[in-house]
């Protein structure tokens, strides 16, 4: 009985020691635009993998963000709260880049601040140490290249964007327009190289999958002769059932390539949509890699080590000639 009691005491002591160790860990925070977006869950999985491989580290990776991707003010408040509470470093994917930068400027934190997935506007980049994520301008370039192969003579096009103030989305749109027009600094396609944006476009999803699918349906109805629909981000495809219903209405056009769809990202529902013929090309980011690499980048910054700026995580391009990443993922 005595030995059993001693064993219980030892187990309790071990648990308390483990809890104390967890409490003493320093926090590396990753704040995303919204927990409702499956893209960001991949960043979380990368963060969790880092945790599983670094159990003895003095640091822990914390993934957080507002419940909804539409809650820009909520994201700013979360960053504010974390900096007030005290974290060792923070990586932010700003939904509203100017608003987030303004708050960072006001707080003037002494800890390392970096951006992940989405950057601050160019004028505000001195507020962060580095950016880790996609070369978003290049992503737009790649999407344009796919469109040019599929529609060499050009045509009518609609761009679907996310949040009006999201720097990453705007950079992709710029890369697309510059490349497909053959001109720099094009705000809207009006016949350059045969491409014109239809009335009512671009459309902004505010990162909402249901709205994204409704917008697609409305644009298809209003523009029976539309040549290309470009999902600059994956929003509509994040709701696969709704996306299937929308694309069912134009499946004959998709098969004949009278209408082409090119979409950003390569999450599992999206690669399935591609294999099902519901898009002609996917240009994918690597969010898992972002979440996995971010803690080590933050630790380097804490230690005063030199870190490249930016740190690009690469792209995966899928098309009918080379299914690539989309073939089996």
Residue ranges and their predicted role:
Residues 1-8:
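Bacterial N-terminal signal peptides that target proteins for export
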Residues 8-14:
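Bacterial N-terminal signal peptides
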Residues 16-22:
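Sec/Tat signal peptide C-region and signal peptidase I cleavage site
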Residues 22-329:
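A residue-level marker of the well-folded mature domains of exported/periplasmic proteins
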């Amino acid at each position: 009985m005595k030995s059993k009691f001693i064993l219980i005491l030892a187990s309790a002591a071990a648990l308390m020691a483990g809890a104390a160790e967890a409490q003493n860990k320093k926090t590396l925070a990753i704040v995303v635009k919204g927990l409702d977006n499956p893209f960001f869950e991949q960043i979380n999985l990368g963060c969790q993998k880092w945790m599983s491989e670094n159990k003895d580290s003095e640091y822990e990776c914390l993934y957080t963000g507002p419940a909804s991707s539409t809650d820009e003010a909520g994201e700013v408040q979360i960053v504010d709260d974390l900096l007030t509470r005290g974290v060792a470093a923070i990586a932010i994917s700003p939904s509203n880049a100017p608003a987030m930068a303004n708050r960072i400027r006001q707080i003037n934190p002494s800890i390392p601040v970096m951006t992940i997935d989405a950057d601050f506007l160019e004028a505000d980049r001195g507020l962060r140490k580095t950016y880790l994520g996609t070369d978003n301008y290049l992503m737009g370039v790649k999407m344009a290249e796919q469109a040019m192969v599929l529609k060499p003579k050009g045509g009518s096009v609609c761009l679907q964007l996310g949040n009006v103030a999201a720097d990453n989305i705007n950079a992709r749109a710029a890369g697309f327009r510059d490349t497909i027009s053959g001109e720099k600094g094009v705000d809207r396609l009006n016949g350059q190289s045969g491409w014109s944006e239809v009335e009512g476009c671009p459309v902004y999803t505010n990162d909402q999958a249901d709205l994204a699918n409704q917008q697609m349906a409305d644009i298809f109805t209003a523009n029976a002769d539309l040549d290309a629909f470009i999902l600059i981000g994956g929003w509509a495809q994040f709701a696969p059932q709704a996306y299937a219903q929308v694309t069912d209405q134009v499946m004959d056009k998709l098969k004949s390539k009278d209408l082409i769809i090119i979409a950003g990202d390569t999450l599992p529902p999206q690669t399935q949509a591609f294999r099902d013929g519901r898009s002609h090309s996917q240009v994918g980011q690597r969010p898992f890699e972002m979440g996995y690499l971010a803690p080590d980048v933050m630790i380097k910054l804490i230690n005063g080590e030199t870190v490249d700026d930016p740190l690009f995580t690469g792209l995966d391009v899928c098309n009918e000639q080379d299914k690539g990443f989309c073939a089996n993922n």
